[in-house]
Amino acid sequence: MSNETKKTGVKKVVLAYSGGLDTSAIIPWLKETYDNCEIIAFCADVGQGDAELEGLHEKAISSGASECYIVDLKEELVADYIYPTIATGAIYEGTYLLGTSMARPIIAKAQVEVARKVGADAVCHGCTGKGNDQVRFEGCFAALAPDLKVIAPWREWEMVSREDLLDYLAERNIETTSSVTKIYSRDANAWHISHEGGELEDPWNEPTKGVWTMTVAPEDAPNEPEYVSLELEQGKITKVNGASLSPYGALTVLNEIAGAHGVGRIDITENRLVGMKSRGCYETPGGTVMFAALRAIEELVLDKSSREWREQIGAQMAHLVYDGRWFTPLCESLLAASIPLANLVSGEVVIKLYKGQAHAVKKRSENSLYSEEFATFGEDDVYNQKDAEGFIRLYSLASRIRALKAK
């Protein structure tokens, strides 16, 4: 593209950069599309692993960026985004623990902060025009920095396939580790990894062993169960097997332990925000254990009405997080409403891991409402069973009146 036909009005743009095929192509495309535009690469370290970050700065510079900021967000992600979300019990369509969805708000927020720091007038992402992430990122940008221009190359350029991107980079002598044989689209963070694309797009194809990366196949997991002891304080895991750990530290340990037992795999066809269905294979080993532990203590400490309210919050929260509406008054309100309930979730849980399953087999809490004296079927001095008669008569009064009226 000649200088005469290049777009103007953008002098400095911050790109959400991963070093993958898409964002590697975006850097030269931005330089060729916008006149005299400086590209700043931004990478969020959300626990995707050292292999994903190694050499990233050099790669961004060699692709044409003037600078690359790598921001460590691991602890903040777990403490300020994951824990508040799972405290509500949010789980999308009954199975998905929102791994990708929870990471998007903190990434977008940090990207805006870098844009402000360097004086950028635009932000850019590599999300496709068919997916949820474009909505999540741009919804966050709208809430946090409505003055910044948003550039979404997948909705602008003429490239439509991985082959197109590979050819584009080859023509410009930009190296990439991607290839047409690397068929899966993966997204990893401290909480999970997702796998999409390739043969997974046909729901009749069973995922091969090569799909999964965080967990062993349940049938190949140890033949003996492993018991993991967890201590919780106000809805957060503070100790794993007696060792005090940070929020991120606890999650990484549980990922390793639970992954070795094949825990946390799901294969689902979900309803995307943009209207289509998509198939995703997700691995959330440590998160599955954490979710089970919180729900186990909740069973002890929440009364019936509180638990029903928490379930309502969780159902609404799952949609807000999935749909990219984290920075909204409603999301803020639901998170605030869940805090008094989460503050009760303190205690100890023992989780049994075996062949892909994670079950709470022991639990106790100083806040427990469970009383063996009250619950026993044997003789007791604290509960007069005759009292139930009056309660049942009043509880069923509406049904009795309706039946009498029907005669």
UniProtKB/Swiss-Prot annotation:
Binding site residues for L-citrulline: Y96, S101, N132, R136, S185, S194, E270, Y282
GO terms, molecular function: argininosuccinate synthase activity; ATP binding
CDD domains per the UniProt record, alphabetical: ASS (cd01999)
Pathway linked to the protein: Amino-acid biosynthesis; L-arginine biosynthesis; L-arginine from L-ornithine and carbamoyl phosphate: step 2/3
Record keyword Cytoplasm present: yes
Any one Pfam family match given in the protein's UniProt record, by short name: Arginosuc_synth
EC number, UniProt record: 6.3.4.5
Residues annotated to bind L-aspartate: T128, N132, D133
HAMAP family membership: Arg_succ_synth_type1
Assigned protein family: Belongs to the argininosuccinate synthase family. Type 1 subfamily.
Listed name of the protein: Argininosuccinate synthase
Gene: argG
